[in-house]
Amino acid sequence: MQLKQNFLSSFIVILILLIAPPANAQSQNDLIDHIIKEKFRIGSSQVFTNEDSPISKNGKAESKLTNNSAADEAEPFIIVNPNDSSHLLISYINLDLASEIFNFPIYYSNDSGQTWNKSSFDTQEFYLDDPFPGFEIAGGGDPIFAFDNDGNIYFTWLYLAANFSNFETRFVVLWGQSSDGGATWGIQEGDKKYLETGGLDLFTGGTNEFGTGVFDRPWFDSDRSGGPHDGNLYCTGLFIPSTTLAMDTTVEQTAGMVLKRKLPSVDSFETSRTQISNGDLAQFGNIKVANNGTIHVVYGNINDQEVRYSTSIDGGLSFEPPSTIGQFSFDIMSTIILVNDRENPALSMALDYSNNNTYIVWNSIDDRVSGLYTYSQDEGVTWKDVQDIATLSGMPDHQVYLPNIASNDNNEVSISWYSLDSLDVGNYMIMHSRDGGKNWETPISLSDAVTDFSEYIVTNPQQQPPIFGDYFTSVKVGCTTYSVWSDGRDMNGPKIYVSANNFCNVLSNTSEITAITEDIQLRSVYPNPSKHILYLEYNLKKQSDISVSIYNTDGKLVQSYLTESIPAGTQTRSYDIHSIIPAAYTILINSEFGTITRKIIKQ
């Protein structure tokens, strides 16, 4: 494996030399270069190691998804079942170069994140069962979910494969479907399993003759309106046609931001694409389908540095001419890294399905990384003035890195982001609005330790920096916002963390988290409220050393208990809390399988 790593390192150097940016306007080749640098993965597990650095906990109640210490974890996506708010799914990039692992694990919960199960589906095993001869997985990303009204779940991901003997590549976007809540996944046979296939010509900086073309940054949503297009599954993305397709005069040519459709009861995506952008360089798209069936799409126009927005009311067969709703700075040819090598406009869109209010946030990269926000209260006809997220948060001197936005059906909106100082150090934050995004409450820190992005800068051209990903995501269910992000606090490479904030709860500045694992479950915390004794009921698949601590709402430790080795099975333990004063607290349970937190009341 070390030989492959060295070869890959040299391969990246060759890529940089082959696709050197020209000294003129940004072009399609520059965009392809940007895609190559994003999708090719070398990994960081052998570059950054510091296993002696403990992860401190101070009661903020955020937690790592897994007990993984070797792999990079990045680009997390979280979704909730629109017809069952207790049903959640998460996936992310999981890259462990030493173990030759590059997959997208799927975790699902049927109890609002109290317990988690891992799907049996392995994207890498599936791909390797039916590979392109002579091609190995060299990168990929973009794990995305969507639900339909019948409870079916759709999943898409992409792989970049390479033949290292001749520099040929394959760029394939795959999709699957689950009808059992995410436990198992069905994949179509033959070419039906591909949403799009293409390849990159590493010597010209364009596409090659394979397939139909490159389809990057796929984003899913489905029509759940009950209208004439109910059940349609839509996917937006950047499309660059293959050289073969580009020369085919018998088909309508599309390029830039496009939409692909899968109709209900059809087992494949249509081969056609609907043009959204006006032939411009377009990337970083998001799609949402409103409760009336209107399709909302937002993307970045690279050359004009504009946030563009468009809608479709005919099921994605056509789109209105895009309108400009904001600006950003982003030079895809720049070699200057401000925070992380994957900094990008990172557009994120949310809808309030009760009134179809539309909210959008994004990054602008100039001499610092800024976060911007706008919203529409008339289904995208007009937009409010763009606002600076750092200013809204009360921290105008801070950078806002990779913001994302979520909304419920009650005029409540949340924005999550990395708030970084001038040295690129900071916490992952969230702030909340209860009046449709007009006014914002004081931000809350979701992470209980800072990430120092400056420590992850790589100067050796034969190494890639650790993978944090191109975006993070969040979803809002009633009062609760679930946020997932890639956290680099322990200098052992980025790891996925998740937090759940209930903005209706009296403990509005804390979260409840359950580690995403099948090895430990906290079945019950009782009585709650409690005066003297608190009981915790565990279910363990195997023995574990468990430590329990209690923190106040300021994050200060008020009570800790001796670490106890608890055997496998269902076990109940009691904890004396008579000495702490009556108030609201967070109890934190640490195990080798992850961390669990719960809110408690001492009477």
What is each residue range found by the language model?
Residues 503-519:
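Low-complexity, Pro/Thr/Ser/Gly/Ala-rich linker/spacer regions in secreted
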Residues 13-14, 437, 534:
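Low-complexity, intrinsically disordered segments with a bias for serine/threonine
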Residues 9-20:
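Bacterial N-terminal signal peptides
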Residues 14-15, 136, 520-522:
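Residue-level detector of alpha-helical transmembrane segments in integral membrane proteins
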Residues 1-7:
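N-terminal secretory signal peptides that target proteins for export/translocation
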Residues 51-58, 515-520, 541:
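Extreme N-terminus of proteins, especially the signal/transit-peptide cleavage junction
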Residues 26-508:
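C-terminal PAP-associated
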Residues 2, 21-25, 517-526, 530-603:
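C-terminal outer-membrane/trafficking sorting elements
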